[in-house]
Amino acid sequence: MLIQVWHHTLYSYDQVVLLGIHKLYLIPQYRPYFRIEHQKFQINPKTEGENFRQDLAGNWYKQCWFTQKTDHLEITGEWIFKLQSFNPFGFILDKSFEESGWSNPMFQFSYEERTAFLIPFLQEKEETYFMDFLTQVRKESSGLVDFIVRLTRMIYQEWKHEIRHEENIWDSTYTFEQKKGSCRDLALMEMDMLREIGLATRFVSGYAFNPDLEDGHELHAWLEVFLPGAGWVGVDPSLGLFTDQSYIPLASHPDPKRTLPVQGSYIGSATSQLVTRVDVKLLHK
């Protein structure tokens, strides 16, 4: 299957400004199920310099800097991806990990090696805000994978999905109480739910091709949970499913703010306005 992605971002300033160093998280992160057949990238105004860099989480991004003043920053990316289908459930879970958490009276999972690397992906403080809800889902589930499937489907069915163009993400407890949220809000809420039972999770932003998604979802957000034996497994509460070849990640991080496509600053007293658009088209099945 071939798909084309066109991503346009425009920051407009009501006065001229001097742009600071920018990080553009608009580099598709490697996955074995897709191949980039074509790519084109344009930045206006012209950069003084740019280079590919990699952050602590392993994400590649484009760092760029400017010397001329401007009243706008325009970024356009175009890609053609060849996608190879795969089974998102094609893994064998570490049974000892599953059984130790599933049989735990407190419903808590624990990784055999709780290394420093895992800490950012786990819950920072002991809270049980979602535990009553999670316990109910557990009663209806036959194991850990089935639990995650049911939880993801329940969020999809019981929380209203909204399109919000603001860059902020609602607090998980607020999203839970409001019974609604954007793809980013729902992803963070499920992240925090899974962290509450000891699972490591990270936030993912990227492109999603799915006819069932409403307009505005092409620049999408989902989460990944680390399951021993399976590794990082993608989950999308906006559609109630495990992610497949239709998901192309741009960045993943335990902190959602670190996955914003454009990160940078400017010098000046101007106010800015953001307009962004993403088009995803099927070229060939």
Question: Which residues fall in each region the model found?
Answer:
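Intrinsically disordered, low-complexity N-terminal segments that are enriched in acidic
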Residues: 1-102
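Secondary-structure boundary elements
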Residues: 100-102, 108-181, 189, 213, ...
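Short N-terminal helix-initiation segments at or just after the protein's N-terminus
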Residues: 14-25, 162-172, 220-224
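Hydrophobic/aromatic-rich core segments of domains that either
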Residues: 153, 185-272
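Short, hydrophobic/aromatic alpha-helical segments in well-folded domains
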Residues: 8, 12, 133, 171-175, ...
